């Protein structure tokens, strides 16, 4: 990685959310979108002057939906990252493709005596998307996680 002396960013971000409760039911949503161009303005004599900063996508977005009922929670999230360059040279061969993941989580909270217990099962990367966040470092495919949390 490299530190850049001067970077200029120009973009637009939008966020929307909604929360609602009906008796024992709850709904929470959150959506984010960013369109942003980040460029290197460190040295006008440098051949990479005004090139896009590595790992800085033009487009990124997320959507989170959480449904709850009487101690249960079902949450899904969708994350998207657009094409981006791995190096400041901005060569096409150093382009990393866009990717998205969908995660799903089921959570239950309950009591055992005076203790609060939370059980969670998660499926991360539900669609088994093959992608690299950093060049040559592939991210895991579909994976599962079970968590049991006992608060004393």
Please report, for each region that a protein language model flagged, where it lies by residue.
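Generic hydrophobic alpha-helical membrane-segment signal
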Residues: 12, 18, 91-96, 113, ...
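Short coil/turn motifs at beta-sheet boundaries
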Residues: 7, 56-58, 97-99, 114, ...
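Gram-negative outer-membrane beta-barrel transporters
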Residues: 2-85, 118, 127
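C-terminal beta-signal and adjacent terminal beta-strands/loops
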Residues: 80-87, 106-152
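Flexible, surface-exposed loop regions and adjacent strand-edge segments
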Residues: 1, 44-52, 82, 91-96, ...
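Hydrophobic, lipid-facing positions within transmembrane beta-strands of outer-membrane proteins
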Residues: 10-14, 59-63, 100-106, 142-148
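Short, glycine/charged-rich beta-strand-loop motifs at protein surfaces that mediate ligand recognition
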Residues: 89-96, 103, 107
